[in-house]
Amino acid sequence: MKKNIFAAATLCTLFFVGCNNNPETVVEEFYKANKANDFEKALSYTNIAKEEREEVIDILSDMGMVIHEYKVLGSTIDEGDTTATVDLHLVTSSAFYPDSLADDIKVPCVKSGRQWQVKLI
């Protein structure tokens, strides 16, 4: 009985992980982690190589950017199903610009294997 429950739980997990693999979800999770200052997790949603992430984390920490809010507005997946653009409304501030700045931006994404990633390089 325990084996059946474990197998069912594993299948459900794999199913839901696969369902969330779209450009909008990846961008949402990327900005959610950034807002929480969890840069290591945020970079796990990008195409930055693992060995380069520590340097990028230092840069992000030094920037002092604060994400107040973000909202995915939509996305476009290109014909080849390998690149996408996610439209995002973003409100930020930083030590350099303490007043909130709101902007609609386009976040590029790339597909690596079956996984979508935020394209930073």
Residue ranges, per PLM feature:
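Sec-dependent N-terminal signal peptides
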Residues: F6-L11
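Positively charged n-region of N-terminal signal peptides that target proteins for export
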Residues: M1-I5
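Short solvent-exposed beta->alpha transition segments
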Residues: E24-T25, N34-D87, Y97
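C-terminal motif of bacterial Sec signal peptides marking the signal peptidase cleavage site
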Residues: F15-G18
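Short, conserved catalytic or interaction motifs in soluble domains
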Residues: N21
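Exposed beta-sheet edge and beta->alpha loop/turn motif
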Residues: I77-I121
